[in-house]
């Protein structure tokens, strides 16, 4: 049986998005034993800065729902909202409220995963599988931890999470990581 996961690192300005397909037909101990998760789509959606707040958010939600309609995922997973600066708080809260409302109107379920839970999972994976010691992980910031996790998890099948100039697309990486986390914790 196959299931599709849509995962969102959703925010006001830009949102990482991933659609992954997992094969649940035969149990496996780890990803490397059997390619059980396939990234069908991943990208960063940018909202239109020229628009006022609500139309800007609506445009972003429309893009997400178009992708939902194309892939028909079984579950939507979102990273919990995080507000880094008070100047952006209102718009981030609007964005999440409008997304929740639209999904509710379509009777679509969304699961939320806290950022700290996701990062802790990545660190645990990297230390448990002996890619790094806890001390070695201290050299990385949170964004780099996710990138290192994805490199370790996917190995040679690594999804593209860097620009041509080697800049980490952290929103995209987080969205992919959310799909992997949901698969490993809830579907395996």
Q: How does the language model describe each region?
A:
Residues 1-188:
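Phosphate- and other anionic-substrate recognition elements at nucleic-acid/protein interfaces
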